[in-house]
Amino acid sequence: MPGPQGGTGAPTMSLGKLSPVGWVSSSHGKRRLTADMISPPLGDFRHTMHVGRGGDVFGDTSFLSNHGGRSGNTHRSPRSFLARKLQQVRRVGVPPRRMASPAAPSPAPPPISPIIKNAISLPQLNQATYDSLVMGKLSFDSTPASSTDGHSGYGLESGFCTISRLPRVEKHSNRDRDRDPDHSQDREQSSFPSEPTPNPELRRSDSLLSFRFDLDLGPSLLSELLGVMSLSEAPAAETPVPTANPPAPAANPAPTAKPPAHAITTLDAVTSLPASAVTSLPAPAAASSPSRGHFPNGVTSVLGPAAEAKPSPVGEGPQVPSNMTFDRHGASWGASRASWGASRASRHYTEMDARRELAGVLPQVHGSWESLNEDWSTPPASVRAPVPTSVQVNAFEFADAEEDDEVKV
């Protein structure tokens, strides 16, 4: 048994006592034996002894006594075992010879390692794997198949699955096939197979980003909503919107007589008329005296040699029927005045109704503007003069009391 190791790191067992070896000296062993030959602790394994290739031995080598040969040769068991091992190590290329067979042989390793049973390996670079790469098929073998170089390959039982890559020539052919519209239907069916096939052919691309999924989700919900809205708006656009105040037909659309040249008509909506052209049409208001009359535009006329007309503070707007006419020497009311009074009493005139009636009156009144300019000697239309507060009217005379009563409401 070797002694304990010295403090200087040199072994206490002399290598010179190994006479059968004869190829190592003590000085040579001391020179080659250094402290860096001992590795640091690895886990829970303690490096307590060392046997070098050059024959240097130190540490606790008592466990080698059990393998020193026969049980009877106890005197040479440790050193003889080391000597034989060193001789075997020195011979290059000669495998070590088994000195003693173990009592119980170790069981053979399992064909499939439980640690790597579910692992996925990279393709093996051998001839069989290269042939499978060219074919481009994913095959699963029921039993482990041995390759040509002697290395056993892993099949389905080992849990190894190798996905082969296609050569560049086959990739270009697949791309041309994808661009062909005739194969588009086949490509969509192959993307989602209905049932698995025994040996399906898989096409592998360069990256995961090149995977194509052809999914048709149909028309979007937004397009459906827009279609329903367009259908609902179409009938609403065709239906006319009823007006708040439907226009009522005029009582007498056709005028009874053409207004003379000196007819004076006040039109509030027409701003281009001269200031002297004032329209004053009688309204069906009750008069306290036969010598006074009220007109729709707020002008009160007092009959006499010099009748004074003053506008009332409240204006009612243009309420002019299309059949109101009178001449210079006298007002001829007749049936037109009675019909207009009845129509006004029956309904209320709005501004839109007055504008419609005004549009029918304008062509008739337009012919009298020239004569009015000559009679009243007004300035040109470009000069806008203010409307006078009082107008002297001498041309209004009632025919008789009966006609005045017809105007009353």
Curated annotation (Swiss-Prot):
Q: Which family does it belong to?
A: Belongs to the BORG/CEP family.
Compositionally biased, Pro residues: which spans?
Answer: 243-258
Subunit composition and interactions: Interacts with RHOQ and CDC42, in a GTP-dependent manner.
**Which intervals carry biased composition (Basic and acidic residues)?**
167-189
Note down the stretches annotated as region Disordered.
1-29, 167-203, 237-260, 282-329
Domain CRIB residue range list: 38-52
Regions of biased composition (Low complexity) lie at 282-291
Q: Cross-referenced PROSITE patterns, in alphabetical order?
A: CRIB
- Identify residues that carry Phosphoserine: 19, 27, 39, 65, 77, 101, 113, 121, 139, 191, 205, 207, 210, 312, 332, 368, 371
Q: What is known of its domains?
A: The CRIB domain mediates interaction with CDC42.
What is the protein name stated in its UniProt record?
Cdc42 effector protein 1
What highest taxon heads this organism's lineage? Eukaryota
Biological process per Gene Ontology, one example term? Rho protein signal transduction
| Residue ranges, annotated region (3 X 7 AA tandem repeats of [PT]-[AT]-A-[ENT]-[PT]-[PTS]-[AG]) | 235-284
Q: What keywords are annotated for this sequence in UniProt?
A: Cell shape, Cytoplasm, Cytoskeleton, Membrane, Methylation, Phosphoprotein, Repeat
Q: One GO cellular component term, please give it.
A: cytoskeleton
Q: How does it sit in the membrane?
A: Peripheral membrane protein
Q: What is its main location?
A: membrane
Q: What are the sequence repeat spans here?
A: 235-241, 242-248, 255-261
Q: Where in the cell is it found?
A: Endomembrane system; Cytoplasm, Cytoskeleton
